[in-house]
Amino acid sequence: MTGQPKTRVSVRIYGQDYTIVGAESPAHIRLVAAFVDDKMHEFSEKNPMLDVPKLAVLTAVNIASEYLKLKEEYNRLREQLKKEKDGERDD
């Protein structure tokens, strides 16, 4: 990973400017930033009394929960596909 060129992208998340440095494309970094910004605004509307640090943690926890559910579903589908492929070989 040390040999990959790094991309620097300026983004705005919940009214704050950040410079994100990463190996992903600028478009991907902007997409991620927009997703986080949208989620923070979504949770802010539901919880208007939260300060920004608590809102950021709530957003991170919810995004992590979504990610883990998708990862679990991906693994389940992968196992199902493997079983189906193994079943075809037995025929």
Swiss-Prot record:
Subunit field text: Homodimer. Interacts with FtsZ.
UniProt source species: Geobacillus kaustophilus (strain HTA426)
Family annotation (Pfam families): ZapA (PF05164)
GO cellular component: cell division site; cell septum; cytosol; plasma membrane
Main subcellular location: cytoplasm
Gene Ontology annotations of biological process type: division septum assembly; FtsZ-dependent cytokinesis; septin ring assembly
Assigned keywords, A-Z: Cell cycle, Cell division, Coiled coil, Cytoplasm, Septation
Keyword Cell cycle carried by entry: yes
Domain of life according to the entry: Bacteria
Protein's name in the database: Cell division protein ZapA
Record gene name: zapA
SUPFAM superfamilies named among the record's database cross-references: Cell division protein ZapA-like
UniProt key word Flavoprotein: no
Annotated compartments: Cytoplasm
Family to which the UniProt record says this protein belongs: Belongs to the ZapA family. Type 2 subfamily.
HAMAP family: ZapA_type2 (MF_02013)
Any coiled-coil regions, as ranges: 58-91
Function summary: Activator of cell division through the inhibition of FtsZ GTPase activity, therefore promoting FtsZ assembly into bundles of protofilaments necessary for the formation of the division Z ring. It is recruited early at mid-cell but it is not essential for cell division.
